[in-house]
């Protein structure tokens, strides 16, 4: 007989860990199934940015804010398209979450709370992140999770990939040795993350759009696929925008490191360069204060691709476009990476990149 649980949590990341702890604290017998060999999920890869209004940190810095103001700001930024009840729930619980993280030793970046312009900005400083991105969250939460495992008997199974949901009965899972097992559970929580590492699913759900991603390799859409197999409908797939911008590295991998994203935020670094499409035309004002407008312009381009064009003087005099690239790394990129192109003049540059020379002149 297989052991029976009250709850199976699929995924030991940002959502799965607190879900398991909360359920176990309420007396439920919990098993956590994680297909990778470690807990944390996307926290190993993400910048870990969070927002909350009415936190102790805000009060300590004299920032007047509230969940009501946070809610209004979200609805403003989303142009009223966000799910109101879900937003309400999130903003009401967010300050408690930030305060809890601080209590358990989260190492907050000293600039926080802040107004962050990498996304469409809030009107009030209510964005937070750790000194080491998402890893700062994991560093604080992991010991608390381990303590909860010891206290409540949470069964953590690493290297165990859930393959099928059995409604009301549990799940089927593949063990590290490749064998299949039925894990009995009265309820299941899917905390598998997104599908940002699954180009095929991304193309299916987003009209064939290409995928260049910073996502964790475990964000493969397996939870979505298991839910769809049961008849679930995926909604709001049209609500997405590309980030501006990233460098595929290595070329052909579809992977982008968020730490290497170019400094294209005008509130942080005013642009010296021009952004052009394949026709050589500037498709957006490079210094437009709204990232929403800039990303919407990018979304209209074929292949979601554009060129950042500059000359040697700009390279020499401007603040670094790629802050983590020293001169040696930049030279290596121009020498061997297909997304870095150098030429002696406009005609030669266009010949090498395929940019229309008449448009660029």
Which residues make up each language-model segment?
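Extreme N-terminal leader/targeting segments of oxidoreductases
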Residues: 1-7, 25, 139
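An anion/pyrophosphate-binding glycine-rich loop and adjacent beta-alpha core
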Residues: 224-226, 230-355, 359
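A structured beta-alpha segment of the ubiquitous adenosine-cofactor-binding alpha/beta core
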Residues: 162, 172-182
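Glycine-rich loop(s) and the adjacent beta-strand/alpha-helix scaffold that form part
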Residues: 176, 183-252
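Conserved N-terminal/central alpha/beta ligand/cofactor-binding core
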Residues: 29, 35-155, 159-160, 272-282, ...
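A conserved short coil-to-beta-strand element within the FAD-binding core of flavoproteins
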Residues: 158-169
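N-terminal Rossmann-like FAD-binding beta1-loop-alpha1 element of flavoenzymes
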Residues: 7-32
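Glycine-rich, N-terminal phosphate-binding loop of Rossmann-like dinucleotide-binding domains
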Residues: 12, 54, 175, 192-193
